[in-house]
Structures are given as structure tokens and as C-alpha cells.
Amino acid sequence: MKTNYEIRYAAHPEDARSYDTKRIRRDFLIEKVFSADEVNMVYSMYDRMVVGGAMPVKEVLKLEAIDPLKAPYFLTRREMGIFNVGGPGVVRAGDTIFQLDYKEALYLGAGDRDVTFESTDAAHPAKFYFNSLAAHRNYPDKKVTKADAVVAEMGTLEGSNHRNINKMLVNQVLPTCQLQMGMTELAPGSVWNTMPAHVHSRRMEAYFYFEVPEEHAVCHFMGEVDETRHVWMKGDQAVLSPEWSIHSAAATHNYTFIWGMGGENLDYGDQDFSLITDLK
């Protein structure tokens, strides 16, 4: 197995206004989340979130304590949320085994123990997408399915944004230190998410897009309300959203995305909305 990681530094919004396409993609887009028998991570300075993916095929993959953590185990001072977006797989956390099927999630609390990822069937490998944030205490590990989620049905087909927001790793479902994660599924014929757009200065966010057909793409919108930028993305890619940035998208096909947040509070509704007509 191989572990790959990079560090991404935070940007001031006034500086980000001057970024060209190449710089925007370099600083915010995470193009390669999954590689066969590798663990890929981006250590972001936005609330020190780690965004990553593990794709075990022929090997069992270990969650290694990368050097920036300066810790004996990855989860020594961290909590983690994991979603399986591939074939059936297994996550082992210490002596506990969790079977995760497609679109099932797992919360791992802080604590010294080994964590490994493996696939049940190498011909249909699991793909474990994860977000991790600093944690001040331990909360119990817990598997969460869509049946456990707080579900909000939003939007309309006429507005091209009919979607179900599955709030899965949130404080209404289980206790966490600062991590919140969920999965939004857009209905056929709907392509817009998070519109009207909002920001939340108390929390950063990361989006991971999947269920995007190969011949289609997602146009993710970011930036300040009056200085928006776009990032064209494919399926199985992620993007970082600073606390000062909107995070929205339209696509050429319906899709699903996983959102993950961390920062000052656990209030999902703490959002500062902008009018659609104010976007520039």
C-alpha cells in the first residue's frame, strides 16, 4: 500500500480574487481522491480538515499517522467521518469491525488505535471517502445508514433543484466534537444544489461529488458573493470551501454529493444566505 498526502494553505479572500483558473484548481480542487491500493489525503489549513480517500483492491490499507499530525496514531487527537461510495467493504477500528455498504457512513471518535480499510470483493472495490477534524475528546464509534439520517426534502423539479439532504453524521444523530457530514441526492432532472447560496463564517466545508456519469461534469461555484468563481469537476472529485466562500453547483446531469463541515459550532442552520440576484 501507499499513502499520499499534501498540505494546502489557506487563502485570504482578497488574494483569491486574483487567482486564475490554474491557481484556483491547484488550491481548492482535489482531483485524485481514489487510487487503487492507496490512501490519498489533503491536509487543509481551513480548520485543519483532512479530506481523503482509500480504495483497497488487493491489499488491506492502513490509516497512517501522516507527519503533519505529529501523533502516534491518525486518530490520537482527531475524529473522522467515512462514507463508502463503492462496493461493500470493511473498516476495522481497533478490535471493532464495521461492514459498510454503498452510501453507508461511519463515525470514528478520537483515540489511539489502528484503522484499516478492506474490500469484500476485489472485482468491486470499496471506496472510502473521509473527512477528519481535530477533536478535544472521544465520542463512541458508530455506523450510520440513511435510515438513521435526518432527511430534509428540498427544492422542486420546476426549480431544477429537487433533492434529499441526508444529515447523517450530525449532532441530531450522534455526538461529535466539530465534524458534521451528510449526503445530498439530486432527483433526475434536477442539477442545482445550495441555491440560493450561503456562507457560514463559523465553519469551512468540503464537497465530494459522485454518481456523475463519465460523459458529464459538475460546475462548482465558489468565492465571495460579489466575486464568484467556478471549478469544473468530474465524478469522484472533491473541493475545499473556505469559510468566506459560497459553495454551490450546477451540472449537466443529476448527481450526489457528500458535504463535510468543521469549525466553530455544530449548528447546521447557522447560514448567511444571499439573494440569487446579488450574485456576481
From Swiss-Prot:
Family named by the database record: Belongs to the KduI family.
Extent of the signal sequence: none
Keyword Isomerase applies: yes
Name of the featured protein: 4-deoxy-L-threo-5-hexosulose-uronate ketol-isomerase
Cofactor section: Zn(2+)
Record-linked InterPro entries: KduI (IPR007045), KduI/IolB_isomerase (IPR021120), KduI_N (IPR027449), RmlC-like_jellyroll (IPR014710), RmlC_Cupin_sf (IPR011051)
Organism: Bacteroides fragilis (strain YCH46)
Function in brief: Catalyzes the isomerization of 5-dehydro-4-deoxy-D-glucuronate to 3-deoxy-D-glycero-2,5-hexodiulosonate.
Catalysed reactions listed for this entry: 5-dehydro-4-deoxy-D-glucuronate = 3-deoxy-D-glycero-2,5-hexodiulosonate
Uppermost EC category: isomerase
HAMAP family per the UniProt record, alphabetical: KduI
Residues engaged in binding Zn(2+): H198, H200, E205, H247
Involved pathway(s): Glycan metabolism; pectin degradation; 2-dehydro-3-deoxy-D-gluconate from pectin: step 4/5
BP-aspect Gene Ontology terms: D-galacturonate catabolic process; D-glucuronate catabolic process; pectin catabolic process
Residues in coiled coil: none
Entry keywords, A to Z: Isomerase, Metal-binding, Zinc
Superkingdom field: Bacteria
Cofactor mode of binding and number, as noted: Binds 1 zinc ion per subunit.
